[in-house]
Amino acid sequence: MSVSFENKETNRGVLTFTISQDQIKPELDRVFKSVKKSLNVPGFRKGHLPRPIFDKKFGEESLYQDVMNALLPNAYEAAVKEAGLEVVAQPKIDVTSMEKGQDWVIAAEVVTKPEVKLGDYKNLEVSVDVEKEVTDADVEERIERERNNLAELVIKEAAAEDGDTVVIDFVGSIDGVEFDGGKGENFSLGLGSGQFIPGFEDQLVGHSAGETVDVIVTFPEDYQAEDLAGKEAKFVTTIHEVKAKEVPALDDELAKDIDEEVETLADLKEKYRKELAAAKEEAYKDAVEGAAIDTAVENAEIVELPEEMIHEEVHRSVNEFLGNLQRQGINPDMYFQITGTTQEDLHNQYQAEAESRTKTNLVIEAVAKAEGFDASEEEIQKEVEQLAADYNMEVAQVQNLLSADMLKHDITIKKAVELITSTATVK
């Protein structure tokens, strides 16, 4: 194989390589044997057409595209490796020569990984806005949240207050004409929940069961039903019931209802304190890691980040998100319908993050390379076993999904992140 690379501009160039006749000839034979099985040529049994007759009738060149499709991927990878390139996007392939009996010549326009000039990435000073200490208020807030989850709605005679639930019938109209979707019966509405359009719930506060209230509201300009957006509507609303939330007493019985593993309220508080401490410690570590990596990225200089890398990151992120939806049994089309979004919206969402994520990945990879990090066979095996446990898969399944090179890359990245984080100090 002959390989050459010519820089055209920063992070871009043309990789020219050949596919030799030593590779082409056996592949031609293989493709011919496959093609002739389906050929019906008068005078010859199906699948028994001699090669010279085929070449005369159809031309050897008719097989070239299939041969190229078979040989090109490996030839391209070998050329990239021989040229010592780190390619970061799909190449634009141009077959410049496919002469009979000659080596084939391919020119690939490639985008290469940009140069990263590292700044300081060890012993960094960082600031984080995350508290590690667990306060009594934190514990009480957690218990109060669970206590409210066990609350019951009890009918009250007094007028409705913010936080109460009302059971209502309502009929909506615009200029005296009812509209689709504007009617409901025995609907339970939490006052202050924001379930209905702004202003609706507020107008029911102070009213009691048995009353009928004319609720006057204006639909928001960006309301999803365009025929209603920005219009004033009247909802004739009848209140059937007013219910108040009644929370259980704060005692040992409540503690046991919340968590059957505890006997007393004091036990529950102690358990929550430990859980909150562990969660805060994890959040603190994540914050330090994020701040340290952000600082290392700020200290580095990336020479002309290729736009293709950002596109690749967006594409990867979108595919990962859609894949996660499908693994959860959620059809992507249904997700877009429910959320009122499109795949283009999803692309735009990830576009905003892609440049930052791409820069971060490049800097961490550069740190791993600068430090000479590698991964042993033992570390790779341990990583495979951990992934299998995390995703409830067989070890062999993980090995089939992820190549040794991918696993090695992930391990070296983890080492780089650990180095940046472990040497950082918090101001």
From Swiss-Prot:
<keyword id="KW-0132">Cell division</keyword>
<keyword id="KW-0963">Cytoplasm</keyword>
<dbReference type="InterPro" id="IPR008880">
    <property type="entry name" value="Trigger_fac_C"/>
</dbReference>
<dbReference type="GO" id="GO:0015031">
    <property type="term" value="P:protein transport"/>
</dbReference>
<dbReference type="GO" id="GO:0005737">
    <property type="term" value="C:cytoplasm"/>
</dbReference>
<dbReference type="GO" id="GO:0003755">
    <property type="term" value="F:peptidyl-prolyl cis-trans isomerase activity"/>
</dbReference>
<dbReference type="GO" id="GO:0051301">
    <property type="term" value="P:cell division"/>
</dbReference>
<dbReference type="InterPro" id="IPR008881">
    <property type="entry name" value="Trigger_fac_ribosome-bd_bac"/>
</dbReference>
<keyword id="KW-0131">Cell cycle</keyword>
<dbReference type="Pfam" id="PF05698">
    <property type="entry name" value="Trigger_C"/>
</dbReference>
<dbReference type="Pfam" id="PF05697">
    <property type="entry name" value="Trigger_N"/>
</dbReference>
<dbReference type="InterPro" id="IPR046357">
    <property type="entry name" value="PPIase_dom_sf"/>
</dbReference>
<feature type="domain" description="PPIase FKBP-type">
    <location>
        <begin position="163"/>
        <end position="248"/>
    </location>
</feature>
<dbReference type="InterPro" id="IPR027304">
    <property type="entry name" value="Trigger_fact/SurA_dom_sf"/>
</dbReference>
<comment type="function">
    <text>Involved in protein export. Acts as a chaperone by maintaining the newly synthesized protein in an open conformation. Functions as a peptidyl-prolyl cis-trans isomerase.</text>
</comment>
<dbReference type="GO" id="GO:0043022">
    <property type="term" value="F:ribosome binding"/>
</dbReference>
<dbReference type="InterPro" id="IPR001179">
    <property type="entry name" value="PPIase_FKBP_dom"/>
</dbReference>
<dbReference type="GO" id="GO:0044183">
    <property type="term" value="F:protein folding chaperone"/>
</dbReference>
<dbReference type="InterPro" id="IPR036611">
    <property type="entry name" value="Trigger_fac_ribosome-bd_sf"/>
</dbReference>
<comment type="similarity">
    <text>Belongs to the FKBP-type PPIase family. Tig subfamily.</text>
</comment>
<keyword id="KW-0413">Isomerase</keyword>
<protein>
    <recommendedName>
        <fullName>Trigger factor</fullName>
        <ecNumber>5.2.1.8</ecNumber>
    </recommendedName>
</protein>
<dbReference type="GO" id="GO:0043335">
    <property type="term" value="P:protein unfolding"/>
</dbReference>
<dbReference type="InterPro" id="IPR005215">
    <property type="entry name" value="Trig_fac"/>
</dbReference>
<keyword id="KW-0697">Rotamase</keyword>
<dbReference type="GO" id="GO:0061077">
    <property type="term" value="P:chaperone-mediated protein folding"/>
</dbReference>
<keyword id="KW-0143">Chaperone</keyword>
<dbReference type="GO" id="GO:0051083">
    <property type="term" value="P:'de novo' cotranslational protein folding"/>
</dbReference>
<dbReference type="Pfam" id="PF00254">
    <property type="entry name" value="FKBP_C"/>
</dbReference>
<dbReference type="InterPro" id="IPR037041">
    <property type="entry name" value="Trigger_fac_C_sf"/>
</dbReference>
